Curated annotation (Swiss-Prot):
Ranges of residues in domain Topo IB-type catalytic: 261-593
Official protein name in the record: DNA topoisomerase I, mitochondrial
Statement: the UniProt record of this protein carries the keyword Transmembrane helix: no
Region called Interaction with DNA, residue ranges: 254-255, 317-322, 414-416
Biological process, per Gene Ontology: DNA replication; DNA topological change
Transit peptide feature range: 1-43
Protein encoded by which gene: Top1mt
Length: 593
């Protein structure tokens, strides 16, 4: 297992950043240290970096005596380690994931590892475990927190602010910058996204001995909690993270980094979108080249061209190389297998349709029927000939060779740049088509969400339908029906007032105008409710936020807001506005991506 882990680290970070001599190396070998960090072509990113280190999750608080765990109908007093893991499961009893066999199996396996020998001998079947008292205890605690008096809520708020002031800021080159995630993630059960094969596994508590601290040589080294020491303290000014560790579920790196609203992060965002804008100038040439390569006599060149077509047209990720069984069976473009692709042979003038069905990033299922060019279809037929379902579709291609090809096409070009470019262009074009100047504010916001939805569909940003969706839709529908009745009543009152006016031969009275204004107001309210219901229904399975935060140039949205008189608060919440503060001055109403 150790060998597999080390090999995975080497592949994950193909280039080892320039080592800066660390002041303290307390644990870990050179091999384990080599993978820490994100690499960058630019060398020095800061001269001074000082911070307090991460804020660790509080120690486990044992259950009160009146809250018991039962096995086979009998109360069992668990050891502290086993009890803590039991509470993780008990808290989640109301969630659907605890009914899934994979979740239950993984949880029970990891839970038994935390038990004493006596507990393992006694507790052998999850079905005989009763966590109901534990679940009720935590539900009551949550309800008590919700109903706290205002004074106590204010006290908790002040304590959180004090913690923020202590751990939530750093000094970067003389400037006080906000840190994004200064707290380590508390221990619990891994849920993952989609049907992740590791759901239910135990996320272990992050300890100071797991953490690498990064700060400047002349700054004060953060103090670890009493009785502990850091894994390592280093001074690497070629990276922007403040602290890092490896989480135990997927052996992936976790970082404490600056808040997205900080100046350095804003500059990185700007650079990301500027690279995508540069692609706009060469994308036609790139497309012409890969279309020409569909006819190449070289198999590798044809596979490269079809893969690039998928990345461009379908916004697929490249797909990272990994050990067999190392993690979930998730794939990207380069790791597609024959079993992931079905070709629907055209007949009677029908289009060439390819069906793709695989687990993408975070085990989110990608299922799509897409019409492709005839040459792409024919190449796919050839790539799949004489292959078994588990064979690679692009067997002459690797992730590294594809990435190198992208760099040869344009400096800085990656699959993510293609996704960013196509997402931003799609948003801009959809907004142009869907927005009408004469529309109401509500309709304009709906148009924006529909444009955003087109991007989310392109990027396969899905979400599970919220459990409360049906209930909230029923509530909304009742409001609509009530509002319709009020509109109908107001219409009758207005007609009656109009008849009275005609009979008296009067000009419009104050009472008539008030009834007219009331009807208009009610009709506006009804329109807003109907639009909200439409928006809610259309986006019930689509995650709009991912693209908005990571792939859409904010200047497009800000320019659209300015052009059509839409308050930017309708598009971005406060946190998002802070994150994209850099874009507000750059985006006039005539900005074009």
């Amino acid at each position: 297992m150790l060998l597999l882990w080390l090999r995975a680290l080497c592949r994950r970070f193909q280039h080892v950043p320039r080592r800066v001599p660390s002041r303290q190396v307390s644990r870990g070998s050179k091999a384990s240290r080599a993978g820490w960090g994100e690499t960058s072509k630019s060398s020095v990113k800061w001269k001074q970096l000082e911070h307090k280190g991460p804020c660790f999750a509080p120690a486990y608080e044992p259950l009160p005596d009146g809250v018991r765990f039962f096995y086979d109908g009998k109360p069992v007093r668990l050891s502290l380690a086993a009890e803590e893991v039991a509470t993780f499961y008990g808290k989640m009893l109301h969630l659907e994931c605890t009914t899934k066999e994979v979740f239950r199996r993984n949880f029970f396996s990891d839970w038994q590892k935390e038990m004493t020998a006596e507990e393992r001998k006694l507790i052998t079947h999850l079905d005989k475990c009763d966590f109901s008292e534990i679940h009720r205890h935590f539900m009551e605690r949550a309800e008590a927190r919700r109903t706290l008096p205002r004074e106590q809520k204010q006290k908790l708020k002040e304590e959180a602010e004090k913690l923020q002031q202590e751990f939530g800021y750093c000094i970067l080159d003389g400037h006080r910058e906000k840190i994004g995630n200064f707290k380590t993630e508390p221990p619990g059960l891994f849920r993952g996204r989609g049907d992740h094969p590791k759901m239910g596994m135990l996320k272990r508590r992050v300890m100071p001995e797991d953490v690498v601290i990064n700060c400047s040589r002349d700054s004060k080294i953060p103090e670890p909690p009493a009785g502990h020491q850091w894994k390592e303290v280093r001074s690497d000014n070629t990276v922007m993270w403040l602290a890092a560790w490896v989480e135990n579920i997927q052996n992936s790196f976790k970082y404490i980094i600056l808040n997205p609203s900080s100046k350095p992060k804003g500059e990185m965002d700007w650079q990301k979108y500027e690279v995508a804008r540069r692609l706009k100038g060469v994308v036609d040439k790139i497309r012409a080249q890969y279309q020409a390569d569909w006819k190449s006599p070289e198999m590798k060149k044809r596979q490269l061209a079809v893969a690039l077509y998928f990345i461009d047209k379908l916004a697929l990720r490249t797909g990272n190389e990994k050990e067999e069984g190392e993690t979930a069976d998730t794939v990207g473009c380069c790791s597609l297998r024959v079993e992931h692709v079905r070709l629907h042979t055209p007949a009677d003038g029908q289009e060439h349709v390819v069906e793709l069905d695989f687990l993408g990033k975070d085990s989110i299922r990608y299922k799509n029927h897409v019409t492709v060019e005839k040459l792409v279809f024919q190449n796919l037929q050839h790539f799949m000939e004489d292959k078994d379902p588990r064979d690679d579709l692009f067997d002459a291609l690797t992730t590294s060779s594809l990435n190198k090809h992208l760099q040869d096409l344009m400096e800085g070009l990656t699959a993510k740049v293609f996704r960013t470019y196509n997402a931003s262009i799609t948003l801009q074009e959809q907004l142009r088509v869907l927005t009408r100047a004469e529309d109401s504010l509500t309709c304009k916001v709906l148009a924006y969400n529909r444009a955003n939805r087109a991007v989310a569909v392109l990027c396969n940003h899905q979400r599970a339908i919220p459990k409360t969706f049906e209930e909230s839709m029923q509530t909304l529908q009742k409001k609509i029906e009530t509002k319709k009745a009020q509109v109908a009543e107001a219409q009758v009152e207005l007609q009656k007032a109009e008849t009275d006016l005609r009979m008296r031969g009067d000009s419009k009275s104050k009472s008539f105008l008030q009834k007219q204004q009331r009807l208009l107001k009610l009709e506006e309210q009804l329109a807003r409710l109907c639009t909200k219901a439409t928006d809610k229904e259309e986006n019930k399975q689509v995650a709009l936020g991912t693209a908005k935060l990571n792939y859409l140039d904010p200047r497009i949205s800000i320019a659209w807001c300015k052009r059509f008189g839409v308050p930017v608060e309708k598009i971005y919440n406060k946190t998002q506005r802070e994150r994209f503060a850099w874009a507000f001055n750059q985006a006039g109403e005539d900005f074009e991506f």
